[in-house]
Structures are given as C-alpha cells and as structure tokens.
Amino acid sequence: KCDFEILMNTTSIPAHHEINMKALRAGKHLYSQKPVGLTVEEVTEQIEAAKAAGVKYTASPIHMLRDDIRFAKKLIADGCIGEIMKVHTNVCHGGPEYFQYRTADPTWFHRPGSGALYDMGVHGLTMTTGILGPAKAVGCMAKISEPVRTVRTGTFDGMQIQADQLYDNYIITLDYGERTMAVVESGFCQKDSRAPQMEIFGTKGTITFVNNGNI
C-alpha cells in the first residue's frame, strides 16, 4: 500500500469512469485521459464527486493550453484574419495496431466503448470548439473502412482483429450559423498524411497548424 495526492489515469477508455470515481471518492486529485466517461451521466457523476471531495479534477486533451492555439486565438481576437468562415481539422492515423512501441493487445480500441471517435475525434472537437465555441448544429457521416485489421509490430505482430463493430472513419460537420462552419475528420483510416492538423480560414487570411507545433 502507498499513499498519494494525485492520480493520473491513463488506462483504457472503458475503464476510465470506474477508476476516476474510486479516486475522487477517496479524496484524490485527478488527471484523467480522455474521454473521462462514455455518457453525460457518467461525466456528471464524476464532476459532482470532485466537488463533494473538494479536489482538483482535470482531463485531456489540453489543446487550449498549447502555445500555438493560444497565439492563434490572439490573432483571431486582434482581427488579423478577419471573420472566420471555416475551420478544418484533421485528427487521424492508421490505427492503433500500427503503433511501433505497442506491447499490449490493441483489440479493445475496436470494441464498443472505445473507437476512433473517442480516441481521436475528441482532439479535433476540442480544438474546434475551443476556438469557435459551441456549435448550433452537428452532423456526422461514418464508415467502416477496414473490417479486419492486422497488428503490424510489437508483441502481437501478425494478430488479426475483427474490427467491424465500430466505425473507423468519421467526417463531422459543425454549423455556427451565419457564414461560419467547421469540419472535423477523425479515424483510423490514414496510414500517412501531410495534411495540416488544423486550418482556420478567415476573410483576410488563413492560419495553418503543422504537426510540429508551429503555425
């Protein structure tokens, strides 16, 4: 046994809520990987538990604390690119079975309670809404691009995963009314890409985010 003041929860997505609740009820400060819960009810329960325990509770993704995004928000506030017309965000990769360093079975990424939207989509949605605020309407198209996947490296190299239970390719649209809209691409269907992580298009100019933290 050991005592501690703060817990960092980096377990698999389906385990987040149970572990978070145990930590909060024990009076521990908490930093949780995303998503902290799979339903509004779970997240609300965690927030109320943190309030009751008087502890600090935060979660990833922390994009709005990034220097490049904070600088972009300042450029927008200063009117440097004019009125925002469109935001395009790309948060995709080829699937967790491609990770070079993986030593654990990645099957759970393709099972209910996980998937590309929870794993990757939250990044794009956080960045987009952090800049534009809440959307007035949201739409989505989704497909299963690879119903069977093969682990490429690591401990489970060569293992096949049945991946037909969840969508792995998403295009999410956000309507902000007037002239402004946003698109978030998310999924496990891009083995490689040179697409910018985010682009903000204004009436006077464009802000482009590249993957090394520069704009």
Give the residues covered by each predicted segment.
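Predominantly a Rossmann-like dinucleotide-binding segment in NAD(P)-dependent oxidoreductases
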Residues: 63-163
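Contiguous beta-strand/loop segments that form the cofactor/metal-binding neighborhood of enzyme cores
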Residues: 126-214
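Beta-loop-alpha module in the N-terminal Rossmann-like domain of NAD(P)-dependent dehydrogenases
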Residues: 1-49
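Hydrophobic residues in well-ordered beta-strands that form the structural core
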Residues: 9, 32, 57-59, 88, ...
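A short helix->loop->beta-strand "cap" motif at the edges of active sites that frequently abuts
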Residues: 26-28, 53-55, 179-181
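Residue-level signal for alpha-helix termini/capping positions
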Residues: 24-25, 51, 77-80
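Rossmann-fold dehydrogenase core element
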Residues: 45-62, 82-86
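Short beta->alpha connector loops at strand-helix junctions that form conserved
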Residues: 33-35, 61, 190
